[in-house]
């Protein structure tokens, strides 16, 4: 296969949700793809700080972080678009008025409240319930003692994303009414949980994973047709919709599967390594 730019979501795609160690078989496939002349990038909702441990692997040339708000390639920052302060303050207030718990993601830190931890603790007790990959990431992160700073430590650092958990979808109504023109409300229901919890994230309409991919293509002189995007959840749609070849993991959402060109084996079944072979990347 001609040289490609390969973009990989993390949770539920590259790794089982919430994990930080790349399986040996996957790492070998990544290294082999790089040796064959392909360039690999993380493409994730995680902020820069949460991608750093993975970026230390020499196989990655950069990353689309914060769902496109912060983009790196070969050590150079290509995109850096935090929320405007009044925008972040306003949407956060509209959510919190209805009891929605938020975590605030800056480039190098994540801030969250005690109540957010308590709500995820409830999910910890529901381990038998199948969760979407974003929910599982947070559940696992809390279980492992995720390094989250208290909201009281937040001093106005530029924010790239707000993650939320609501008791009911209707709790988001005011924020959507006021800010739907500025943010994409990327929501997922917490399957099999009778309390009606909804988790998700706010993505600034100024960017998305797709615009991050385009920024890297422009920087390196590639076209979108030269890209391959791997994802598993609805927040990967903006990535897979622009990729030359789009791949959804077998453990992914039904919505994403319908929009992608290919279905790879599950993240739990060496899906990346197997699909790299199927595509002729290795």
Label the model's feature ranges.
Residues 1-5, 23, 199-282:
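Mg2+-dependent phosphoryl-transfer enzymes with acidic/Ser/Thr/Gly-rich catalytic loops
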Residues 2-19, 91, 240:
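Asp-based phosphoryl-transfer active-site loop
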Residues 21, 27-131:
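Active-site phosphate-binding/coordination module
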Residues 37-41, 59-61, 160-161, 225-226, ...:
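Short active-site oxyanion
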Residues 51-55, 175, 256, 272:
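Hydrophobic packing residues within well-ordered alpha-helices of enzyme cores
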Residues 58-59, 67, 179-182, 242-243, ...:
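Short, structured coil segments at secondary-structure junctions
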Residues 60-67, 184-188, 246-251, 264-266:
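Short hydrophobic/aromatic-enriched beta-strand-loop microsegments
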Residues 109-228:
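Conserved acidic, metal-coordinating active-site core of Asp-based
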């Amino acid at each position: 296969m001609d040289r490609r730019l390969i973009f990989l979501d993390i949770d539920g795609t590259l790794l089982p949700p919430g994990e930080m160690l790349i399986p040996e078989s996957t790492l070998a496939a990544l290294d082999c793809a790089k040796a064959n002349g392909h360039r690999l990038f993380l493409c994730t909702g995680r902020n820069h700080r949460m991608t750093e441990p993975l970026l230390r692997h020499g196989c990655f040339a950069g990353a689309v972080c914060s769902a496109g708000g912060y983009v790196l390639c070969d050590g150079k920052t290509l995109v850096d678009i935090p929320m405007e302060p009044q925008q972040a303050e306003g949407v956060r207030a509209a959510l919190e008025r209805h009891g929605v718990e938020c975590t605030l993601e800056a480039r190098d830190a994540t801030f969250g409240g005690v109540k957010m931890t308590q709500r995820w603790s409830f999910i910890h007790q529901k381990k038998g319930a199948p969760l979407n990959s974003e929910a599982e990431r947070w559940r696992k992160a809390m279980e492992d003692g995720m390094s989250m700073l208290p909201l009281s430590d937040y001093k106005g650092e530029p924010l790239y994303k707000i993650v939320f958990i609501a008791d009911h979808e209707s709790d988001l109504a005011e924020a959507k009414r006021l800010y739907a023109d500025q943010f994409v409300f990327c929501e997922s229901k917490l399957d099999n949980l009778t309390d009606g919890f909804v988790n998700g994230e706010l993505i600034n309409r100024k960017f998305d994973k797709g615009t991050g991919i385009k920024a890297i293509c422009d920087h390196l002189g590639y076209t979108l047709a030269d890209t391959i995007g791997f994802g598993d959840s609805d927040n990967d749609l903006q990535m897979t919709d622009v990729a030359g070849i789009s791949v959804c993991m077998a453990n992914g959402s039904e919505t994403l599967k319908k929009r992608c060109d290919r279905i790879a084996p599950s993240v739990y079944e060496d899906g990346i390594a197997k699909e790299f072979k199927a595509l002729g990347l290795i």
